[in-house]
Amino acid sequence: ADHGDMLGERGLWYKMSFHEWSARVPFIVSAPQRFQSGRVGTPVSLVDLLPTLLDLSGDPHLEAPADRLDGQSLVPLLQGEVASLDRPVISEYLGEGAVAPMVMVRWGRYKYIACPADPPLLFDLQEDPDELANLAGRPEMQDIEVQLDQVVRKHQDLNQLHEAVVASQQRRRLVFAAHMTGTHTPWDFQPVFDATNRYMRNHLDLNDVEGRARIEST
């Protein structure tokens, strides 16, 4: 899964936030012939899946990919060569319940949440696993907060992204209104079936019918 669920914690349901109940899910790998069993506490991401699979397969494209890979191979973690990865892990949310783009950065024990519509949140998950104490704005946490905020700014300009989303919504609303004017023509894909050639008929050979059911015509 790519997310968990809020089950009443903080009065919230579903996902729609970056609190641990929603954002944290286990990344499970089962390869008993290759790796010893164990648990690793370092944050990872779904974008690590592709480089990990490339690494496991021995694919040479991992060394010189055609395009930049966002993630990092987790094979060193799986093989016990390292205990953690010292790098930020980034998550984005622009879906239901968000009035502006939200970005979460996990780096070691710290979690930082940024959103143009809300004050920043900073949690020390080692000391505060329930995320009850927001450390953002505290003088003693200034260096950590600045470091994580720079990760967000380097990743994405949230104000610019918000403007782009609103502009896209306005264009799509205009197109939708135009399509709904006069005779409505749906864009939904509608496959057309010819029943005379779809099922077994006297004029059709069994092998031809079964072949068409399995192989796309060209």
Regions found by a protein language model. Give the residues of each.
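Metal-dependent active-site segment of extracytoplasmic phospho-/sulfohydrolases and closely related
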Residues: 1-11, 57-60
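Short catalytic/ligand-binding loop motif for oxyanion handling, primarily in non-cytosolic enzymes
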Residues: 5-9, 15-16, 99-101, 113, ...
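Substrate-binding rim/cap in mid-to-C-terminal beta-strand-loop elements of soluble/periplasmic
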Residues: 13-83
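Active-site beta-strand termini and strand-to-loop segments that position acidic
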Residues: 31, 105-108, 115, 125
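Non-transmembrane alpha-helical segments in soluble domains
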Residues: 50-54, 75, 79, 123, ...
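WW-domain-binding short linear motifs
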Residues: 87-91, 166
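Intrinsically disordered, low-complexity polar regions and short flexible loop motifs
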Residues: 128
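Long, internal low-complexity/basic segments
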Residues: 137-218
